[in-house]
Regions:
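A short, exposed helix-loop element centered on a Lys and neighboring polar residues
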Residues: 114-115, 168
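The beta1-alpha1 cofactor-binding region of Rossmann-like NAD(H)/NADP(H)-dependent oxidoreductases
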Residues: 36-37, 55-70, 96
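Conserved glycine-rich cofactor-binding loop
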Residues: 9-13
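A glycine-rich helix->loop->beta "capping" turn
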Residues: 49-53, 71-84, 90-95
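Ankyrin-repeat alpha-helix packing hotspot
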Residues: 107-108
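Conserved glycine-rich Rossmann-like NAD(P)H-binding loop of the short-chain dehydrogenase/reductase
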Residues: 25-40
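Catalytic loop of short-chain dehydrogenase/reductase
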Residues: 87-94, 123-173
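Aromatic pocket-lining residues of Rossmann-like dinucleotide-binding sites
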Residues: 22
Length: 173
């Protein structure tokens, strides 16, 4: 049975390879990316393989995450799978809202997108959060809000740990 699957970060790496494989299996892919040029290339490359739609959004912006959810809901009454794959490691450190970009994209955006799309996932929907073996134990000094600077890898590791923690909690609900 063909499924409708939203993949964030579908223009590169794991997201791209996942989109390719799922298209080959006959599923409809809703491919998200933050770069319009890469999304256009993706469409040209994969359009003959199967049904693919693209969605442009910068997941470091809360408004863009909400817009992505709204656009998906406008075009689909239901989806079967949400794959939260998009992530950043090395980037500008702070969003326009004053938040760490890595934490916003890697943790907060998947949470917010999942929350907004839950009504479309219905009873048998699935959420897959792509984490990392790079997650690390909590840096309580950083967590307390004291002014410290984390390396890119430390911040990435903390954001992936948070993703794993909320995924575990959500799986029990």
């Amino acid at each position: 049975m063909s499924k409708t699957i939203l993949i964030t970060g579908a223009t590169d790496g794991i997201g791209l390879e996942t989109a390719k494989k799922l298209l080959q299996q006959g599923h409809t892919i809703l491919a998200h990316g933050r770069n319009e040029e890469k999304l256009n290339k993706l469409t040209k490359e994969l359009a003959t393989t199967g049904k693919i739609e693209t969605y442009l959004a910068d997941l470091s912006s809360k408004d863009a995450v909400l817009y992505l959810a709204k656009e998906v809901a406008k075009n689909h009454s239901s989806i079967n799978v949400l794959i939260n794959n998009a992530a950043v490691l090395k980037t500008d450190v702070v969003t326009t809202d004053g938040l760490d970009v890595r934490f916003v994209v890697n943790t907060l955006a998947p949470y917010l997108l999942t929350k907004k799309l839950l009504p479309l996932l219905k009873d048998s929907g699935r959420v897959i959060n792509v984490a990392s073996a790079a997650q690390a134990s909590v840096n309580f000094h950083a967590l307390s809000g004291k002014a410290i600077t984390l390396t890119d890898m430390e911040a990435y590791s903390q954001s992936k740990l948070a993703l794993i923690m909320w995924s575990t909690t959500m799986s029990k609900i």
